C-alpha cells in the first residue's frame, strides 16, 4: 500500500535543496502520515491518514 493519505490524498512531493552557492539537489517533502484503524464499509481497516485529516475531524477512528 502506497504512503498516501486515504482521506485527503496527501503524498510525498519533490523539491530542491539549495546550498549557499545556489546549487540544487532533489529532496523529498513527506507528509505526516499516521497508520490508523477506521471503519470502511462496516469493517475495521488500517489505512494511512495525514495528521491534518486527523486534527480536522475527517477521520472516525474505531
Swiss-Prot record:
SUPFAM superfamilies according to UniProt: L28p-like
Coiled coil: none
Organism domain of life: Bacteria
Gene Ontology biological-process annotations: translation
Pfam hit, one: Ribosomal_L28
Gene Ontology cellular component list: ribonucleoprotein complex; ribosome
Keyword terms, alphabetized: Ribonucleoprotein, Ribosomal protein
Any one GO MF annotation of this record: structural constituent of ribosome
Annotated InterPro entries: Bacterial_rp_bL28 (IPR050096), Ribosomal_bL28 (IPR026569), Ribosomal_bL28/bL31-like_sf (IPR034704), Ribosomal_bL28_bact-type (IPR001383), Ribosomal_bL28_sf (IPR037147)
UniProt similarity note: Belongs to the bacterial ribosomal protein bL28 family.
PANTHER family reported in the protein's UniProt record: 50S RIBOSOMAL PROTEIN L28 (PTHR39080), LARGE RIBOSOMAL SUBUNIT PROTEIN BL28A (PTHR39080:SF1)
Protein name: Large ribosomal subunit protein bL28
Encoding gene, per UniProt annotation: rpmB
